[in-house]
Amino acid sequence: MLLCTAVRQRIINIASKEGISLHKLALSSGIPYSTLSSFMNGKSNSLTLTTLLHLCEGTHMELQDFFKDPLFKEVEAEDNQEVSVK
């Protein structure tokens, strides 16, 4: 599974577990819905770690716990994948 696919699925799973929409997740995380929507719809394959941290904070989850999921056991990096830290 590609890393961006695993991250997308994890976000869907978290929103489902919390019983909230992606729009509500963006609001509770303090990030623009357009940012989350663009990533989730595949228009963008990158999400900054800062944005991911805000998503975690919006659900009272530690960043390290986001990656403690079987989805991340066998991920593959995309070609030319960039990691942005802001």
Task: Annotate each PLM feature.
Residues 1, 38, 67-86:
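Short, charged recognition helix plus adjacent turn
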Residues 1-20:
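A short, Lys/Arg-rich alpha-helix, primarily the initiator
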Residues 12, 23, 53:
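Residues within the helices of the helix-turn-helix
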Residues 15, 26, 56:
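The alpha-helix within a helix-turn-helix
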Residues 19-38:
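Short alpha-helical DNA-recognition segment
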Residues 32, 43, 70-74:
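The DNA-recognition helices of helix-turn-helix-type DNA-binding domains
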Residues 43-54:
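Short, basic-rich loop-to-helix N-cap that marks the start of a DNA-contacting helix
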Residues 57-68:
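Intrinsically disordered, low-complexity basic tails/linkers immediately adjacent to helix-turn-helix/homeobox/MYB/SANT
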